[in-house]
A protein has these predicted regions:
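C-terminal helix-to-coil terminal segments
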Residues: 2-8, 12, 273-303
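Short, well-structured alpha-helical segments in soluble
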Residues: 80-92
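Short beta-strand elements in bilobed, periplasmic/extracellular small-molecule ligand-binding domains
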Residues: 60-74, 188-190
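Anion-binding alpha/beta catalytic cores of soluble intermediary-metabolism enzymes, centered on
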Residues: 98-159
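Positively charged, low-complexity intrinsically disordered leader regions
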Residues: 1-33
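Rossmann-fold NAD(P)-binding glycine/threonine-rich loop
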Residues: 109-126, 130, 233-290
């Protein structure tokens, strides 16, 4: 049984954030006579993507956010998808647009992201939003790094001066996470597959964030006893205890690392719930911006 004293409970933090979001969505409804709205586009029948979309829609509906699910077949042409996005951009009743990734191989992910109106880009992947994040004037921040930062601020209270090491340099997690931590006055090391002496970098971390997509890659030889570990990885592997069944593991070897570090996010139940909660935050923010209404960001005060 997991000792909850060392676990960072992502579900609890997500619920804490959603409790702040729900009254904002109600206030929006009373002011503008409609719910904030989120359009979610799903292409194909990928089982994992279907689960993620269902979770997002369920959370939206539970928080008084209207969700519009648009399912398209795998063979949908890129031009057809781009035209659908353009129509959603022009629809004043749509506040946020999300295209579930990954996409079929014949569709350019970057072309799709570039087509979304930056003010409706609740995933925070558009180059305009990336640029604003790096300039220190963020518009929409990618949901997973935003959720990680929320948990870190609650766990540590003060991030200034902390050594933060990120394993993985993707546009979805690694790079925006580095920018957020730099803005919080951390000393940031962004590592990747070509980094030399990776263990030595990780061993020095006050904050270690794993987002490399390699099951249980980081073990007890990578960490120190004062580290706060955030495991972004979601990997499905064979369950050694149950024949023909699978299980979810992170990029951290939880069993080996748990007894050493100060705090750690489990998989599942760590980063995942916060990612969805931050998507709801971005959708509410987009809805208020759509109405040119002042939005006081509830994440500015994370405690």
């Amino acid at each position: 049984m997991k000792n909850l004293d060392k676990n960072i409970d992502g579900k609890s933090y997500a619920n804490k954030l959603l409790k702040k979001i729900f009254p904002l969505s109600q206030e929006y409804f009373y002011k503008f006579n409609r719910k904030p709205s989120l359009a979610v586009i799903l292409i194909g029948e990928d089982p994992a993507s279907n689960v993620y979309v269902k979770n997002k829609i369920r959370t939206a509906e539970a928080n008084n956010i209207k969700s519009i699910e648009i399912k398209l077949p795998t063979e949908t042409l890129e031009e057809e998808l781009l035209q659908k996005i353009v129509s959603l951009n022009e629809d004043v009743e749509i506040d946020g647009i999300l295209v579930q990734l990954p996409l079929p191989n014949h569709i350019s992910e970057q072309n799709v992201i570039n087509t979304i109106n930056p003010d409706k880009d609740v995933d925070g992947f558009h180059p305009v939003n990336f640029g604003k994040l790096y300039m220190g004037v963020p518009n929409f921040v990618p949901c997973t790094p935003l959720g990680c930062l929320y948990m870190l601020k609650n766990e540590l209270k003060h991030l200034s001066g902390k050594n933060a090491v990120i394993v993985g340099r993707s546009n979805i997690v690694g790079k925006p996470m580095a920018s957020l931590l730099l803005s919080s006055n951390c000393t940031v090391t962004l590592t990747h597959s070509k980094t030399k002496y990776l263990k030595e970098h990780c061993k020095k971390a006050d904050i270690l964030i794993a987002a490399v997509g390699c099951p249980e890659m980081i073990d007890d030889t990578y960490v120190n006893e004062n580290a706060i570990v955030i495991d972004v990885g979601i990997n499905r592997v064979a369950d050694p205890l149950q024949n023909k069944k699978s299980m979810l593991v992170g990029d951290i070897n939880y069993k080996k690392v748990y007894n050493i570090v100060k705090k750690i996010t489990p998989v599942p139940g760590g980063v995942g719930p916060m990612t969805i909660a931050c998507l709801m935050h971005n959708t509410i923010k987009a809805a208020y911006k759509n109405k040119k209404y002042n939005f006081i960001d509830i994440l500015e005060d994370s405690t």
